[in-house]
Amino acid sequence: MSTQAAGNQTSSGATDSEDSYDSWYIDEPQGGQELQPEGLVPSCQPNVPPSLYHTCLAVLSILVLFLLAMLVRRRQLWPRCGHGRPGLPSPVDFLTGDRPRTVPAAVFMVLFSSLCLLLPTEDPLPFLSLASPPGRDGEAETSRGPWKILALLYYPALYYPLAACATVRHGAAHLLGSLLSWAHLGVQVWQRAECPESPKIYKYYSLLASLPLLLGLGFLSLWYPVQLVRSFGHGAATGSKGLQSSYSEEYLRTLLCQKKLKSSSHTCKRGFASQAWMYFRHSVYIPQRGFRLPLKLVLSVTLTGTAIYQVALLLLVGVVPTIQKVRAGITTDVSYLLAGFGIVLSEDRQEVVELVKHHLWALEVCYISALVLSCLLTFLMLVHSLVTHRTNLRALHRGGALDIGPLTQSPRPSRQAIFCWMSFTAYQTAFTCLGLLVQQILFFLGTLTLAFLVFMPMLHGRNLLLLHYLKSSWPFWLTLALAVTLQNAAAHWAFLDTHHGRPGLTNRRALYAATFLLFPVNVLVGTMVAAWRVLLSALYNAVHLGRMDLSLLPLRAATLDPGYHTYCNFLRMEASQSHPAATAFCALLLRTQRPKPRATPQDGLRLGEEEEGIQLLQTKDLVAKGAGPRARQGRARWGLAYTLLHNPALQAFRKTALPGARPNGAQP
């Protein structure tokens, strides 16, 4: 009996111990479920897998590209054996000045935003099933490297037909562009609406980063239907209308009909407001009549703005939410953590918590302030660089040369110039991203130093490290300040004298003695000046890192700056291959070959006027109106002929003498 009772007691004790043992893990999930940490966004499982979306879009893009190829006839690659066969359409006419620029800008913005969305995604190519799921040890992550490299080629090919629909200039192409843009926009909107949150980086990062992508696709989904309606309404009249109002003719009209500046404008005194306005006009790009930025520069501006948004968004959502979570989770245990490092902020633990939260808030303010300052400076540098682009292009159009040292000044295209022209827009985007990141680091360190070494100690009256350092080293700084002040005062009052209105040296013995005696002190001053020089150089280079029109190296070493070297070759390529004067001349030649219409509107051009170039001199100038038609013809002839013959930038368009040529262009 006693043994059974003891056994029952033992079994009951074991049961109690097991119950108490299980109670230790009462917070563990039951049934093998995993407990999600607080604040972690679960992965979204869409109803339709993204692989199906991308497969359909890829097939649709290939079909659209095939249909566009049927509309384009191949004439350049094999003119003898392949004439009239379908050819691959061009996505963007980069060297054509009269094509719409909004479509390439929107497509490039969509492409760059899609590449930025590759950062948080797990599947770079969603329509391909990866070999192995991601593991905890990161082995599967390394296997995704080749797929990410392949994604850099997949997305340009995916959006290739979307851009090519605008270059074909056909109603069917506009219809295909409308369908393709609607498909892309519908897929993106459906995905963002079904899964607005993502567990990577920040829960709304994918949604915020896709805003430029949605904006570009939304514009394309409206632009293509509008062009389709216009093609049905106007027909082929739109092409001739665009040809008559071409940029090249406007450029020549502005160039050959410049009004003389009034002499009073140079002698009148400008006030402060007018001087400020002139400085604003020279610092900020304002569109001017008769000049249009090349398409490559327009794309660079669009991608720079998109890069500023994407990098700023990544820097913001990658750091600020983490700081806010840390500040919200501060408890009294932080006092023990700081005491372990020998830091005692206060005897009251609650006061320590408030101080730590206040310092974390100051850290967040410094970070956001540095980010705002970096974005503003990058944007201002972008706007100011457009003025430099316009000045350099106008100089090259007039036949000038850029002073960049030993680089060749030949206007003809070369292998290096073509490579630089191809990579200019991509380089500009990369320089902007890296420049914004470097500025953020430098400005954050600067604001952090000012906040925690100057403002916060003075506000709380404790941890005055900077003031203690200045208190202990004031003789050193006072000596340097007195040395600089006394040398400047002596140079002005003792060693400089004016004779007959001309300054000259005096008291040379005292000057030599002071120079010898103050040499050790000047070494210390030079050390401080060298540190200040390094700081200024770092700030200047960080601010101007995103600008390719400026060299970060001296003029003699400008060829070693790859960004500036690429920019100069890009300008030469643009000036030699898309010169407005040569384009206008070719347009006039093509126009004279057309049959003369029966009825010419008032704004139209007669055949004789086209041959003589009189339409380039249609101006409201009274002097030009008072002159006879022969005088206008002479000015047009000499102006255009002199530009075509004596402008070095147009040498690339010249051909050798034709054998057996006859006057007036007749061929035997």
From Swiss-Prot:
<comment type="subunit">
    <text>Homodimer. Interacts with JAK2 and STAT5. Interacts (via extracellular domains) with RBP4. Interacts (via cytoplasmic domains) with RBP1.</text>
</comment>
<feature type="transmembrane region" description="Helical">
    <location>
        <begin position="369"/>
        <end position="389"/>
    </location>
</feature>
<feature type="topological domain" description="Cytoplasmic">
    <location>
        <begin position="390"/>
        <end position="423"/>
    </location>
</feature>
<dbReference type="GO" id="GO:0019841">
    <property type="term" value="F:retinol binding"/>
</dbReference>
<feature type="topological domain" description="Extracellular">
    <location>
        <begin position="191"/>
        <end position="206"/>
    </location>
</feature>
<feature type="region of interest" description="Interaction with RBP1">
    <location>
        <begin position="236"/>
        <end position="294"/>
    </location>
</feature>
<keyword id="KW-1133">Transmembrane helix</keyword>
<feature type="glycosylation site" description="N-linked (GlcNAc...) asparagine">
    <location>
        <position position="8"/>
    </location>
</feature>
<dbReference type="GO" id="GO:0071939">
    <property type="term" value="P:vitamin A import into cell"/>
</dbReference>
<feature type="topological domain" description="Cytoplasmic">
    <location>
        <begin position="167"/>
        <end position="169"/>
    </location>
</feature>
<feature type="topological domain" description="Cytoplasmic">
    <location>
        <begin position="73"/>
        <end position="101"/>
    </location>
</feature>
<feature type="topological domain" description="Cytoplasmic">
    <location>
        <begin position="228"/>
        <end position="296"/>
    </location>
</feature>
<keyword id="KW-0812">Transmembrane</keyword>
<feature type="transmembrane region" description="Helical">
    <location>
        <begin position="424"/>
        <end position="444"/>
    </location>
</feature>
<keyword id="KW-0597">Phosphoprotein</keyword>
<keyword id="KW-0325">Glycoprotein</keyword>
<feature type="intramembrane region" description="Helical">
    <location>
        <begin position="511"/>
        <end position="548"/>
    </location>
</feature>
<feature type="region of interest" description="Disordered">
    <location>
        <begin position="1"/>
        <end position="28"/>
    </location>
</feature>
<feature type="topological domain" description="Cytoplasmic">
    <location>
        <begin position="496"/>
        <end position="510"/>
    </location>
</feature>
<keyword id="KW-0683">Retinol-binding</keyword>
<feature type="compositionally biased region" description="Polar residues">
    <location>
        <begin position="1"/>
        <end position="15"/>
    </location>
</feature>
<protein>
    <recommendedName>
        <fullName>Receptor for retinol uptake STRA6</fullName>
    </recommendedName>
</protein>
<dbReference type="GO" id="GO:0016918">
    <property type="term" value="F:retinal binding"/>
</dbReference>
<feature type="topological domain" description="Extracellular">
    <location>
        <begin position="318"/>
        <end position="368"/>
    </location>
</feature>
<dbReference type="GO" id="GO:0005886">
    <property type="term" value="C:plasma membrane"/>
</dbReference>
<dbReference type="GO" id="GO:0043010">
    <property type="term" value="P:camera-type eye development"/>
</dbReference>
<feature type="topological domain" description="Extracellular">
    <location>
        <begin position="445"/>
        <end position="474"/>
    </location>
</feature>
<keyword id="KW-0472">Membrane</keyword>
<feature type="topological domain" description="Extracellular">
    <location>
        <begin position="123"/>
        <end position="145"/>
    </location>
</feature>
<feature type="transmembrane region" description="Helical">
    <location>
        <begin position="475"/>
        <end position="495"/>
    </location>
</feature>
<feature type="transmembrane region" description="Helical">
    <location>
        <begin position="207"/>
        <end position="227"/>
    </location>
</feature>
<feature type="transmembrane region" description="Helical">
    <location>
        <begin position="52"/>
        <end position="72"/>
    </location>
</feature>
<keyword id="KW-1003">Cell membrane</keyword>
<comment type="function">
    <text>Functions as a retinol transporter. Accepts all-trans retinol from the extracellular retinol-binding protein RBP4, facilitates retinol transport across the cell membrane, and then transfers retinol to the cytoplasmic retinol-binding protein RBP1. Retinol uptake is enhanced by LRAT, an enzyme that converts retinol to all-trans retinyl esters, the storage forms of vitamin A.</text>
</comment>
<dbReference type="GO" id="GO:0038023">
    <property type="term" value="F:signaling receptor activity"/>
</dbReference>
<dbReference type="InterPro" id="IPR026612">
    <property type="entry name" value="STRA6-like"/>
</dbReference>
<keyword id="KW-0813">Transport</keyword>
<feature type="topological domain" description="Extracellular">
    <location>
        <begin position="1"/>
        <end position="51"/>
    </location>
</feature>
<keyword id="KW-0675">Receptor</keyword>
<feature type="transmembrane region" description="Helical">
    <location>
        <begin position="146"/>
        <end position="166"/>
    </location>
</feature>
<dbReference type="Pfam" id="PF14752">
    <property type="entry name" value="RBP_receptor"/>
</dbReference>
<dbReference type="GO" id="GO:0034633">
    <property type="term" value="P:retinol transport"/>
</dbReference>
